[in-house]
């Protein structure tokens, strides 16, 4: 769900970020680790070749772009869609999900479902039914945009349904289980561990961390 937006036409590749200032959020969390990894893998030193300007909230980073105080930002959805509608000349320069896949060979993970092992084992049939419903929900989110957007507004996920409906196709909402899920998560955890072992509790998770189904 991460994208680099630019008010201009100078950034068409990760390498084009050299010498630029990027406003973003998430220092010490996923956005920073993802950005640093993608920059490094493309030959851009995140400590010397670019300036990373972090803010605590995406709204703060967006306000810098809106005020003309920054021209490049890395933002998540739905802030990207909101920004594109509010800032004349702003465009999506890089899809960081695609850039991650190019260098990592797996999908970028930004959200997961977790469950207590004892609860799953106590009633596997009930958990399987829940997973079927969860899968159907993901499919609905990607195909029934109008109703999904209405729910986003109803439950306070996004302020306006119209904004949610525009943003949903670019939110990369997927349902992964089994080996595919494990592969993507292991790649992601390895990147986090290399950046800061404490970000994953000091060690990589064992095989029993993952639900095989």
Language model feature labels by segment:
Residues 1-44, 53, 71, 77, ...:
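Short, glycine-/small- and polar/acidic-enriched structural segments
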Residues 9, 14, 23-31, 53, ...:
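Extracytoplasmic/periplasmic, Sec-exported soluble proteins
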Residues 18, 109-111, 188, 205:
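Residues that flank catalytic or metal-binding motifs in active/ligand-binding sites
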Residues 57-152:
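Pocket-lining segment of extracytoplasmic ligand-binding domains
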Residues 186-213:
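Conserved C-terminal helix/tail region of periplasmic/extracytoplasmic solute-binding proteins
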């Amino acid at each position: 769900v991460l994208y680099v937006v630019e008010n201009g036409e100078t950034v068409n590749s990760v390498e084009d970020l050299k010498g630029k200032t990027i406003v973003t959020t998430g220092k010490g969390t996923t956005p920073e680790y993802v950005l640093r990894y993608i920059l490094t893998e493309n030959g851009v030193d995140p400590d010397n070749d670019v300036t990373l300007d972090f803010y605590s909230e995406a709204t703060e980073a967006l306000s810098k772009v809106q005020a003309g105080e920054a021209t490049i930002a890395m933002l998540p959805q739905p802030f990207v869609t909101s920004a594109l509608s509010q800032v004349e000349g702003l465009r999506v320069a890089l899809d960081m999900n695609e850039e991650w896949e190019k260098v990592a060979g797996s999908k970028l993970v930004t959200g997961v479902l977790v469950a207590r092992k004892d609860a799953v084992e106590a009633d596997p049939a009930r958990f399987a039914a829940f997973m079927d419903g969860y899968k159907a929900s993901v499919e609905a989110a990607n195909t029934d945009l109008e109703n999904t957007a209405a729910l986003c507004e109803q439950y306070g996920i996004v302020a306006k349904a119209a904004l949610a409906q525009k943003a949903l196709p670019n939110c990369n909402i997927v349902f992964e289980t089994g080996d595919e899920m494990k592969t993507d998560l292991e790649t992601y955890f390895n990147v986090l561990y290399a950046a800061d072992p404490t970000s994953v509790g000091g060690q990589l998770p064992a095989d029993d961390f993952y639900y095989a189904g």
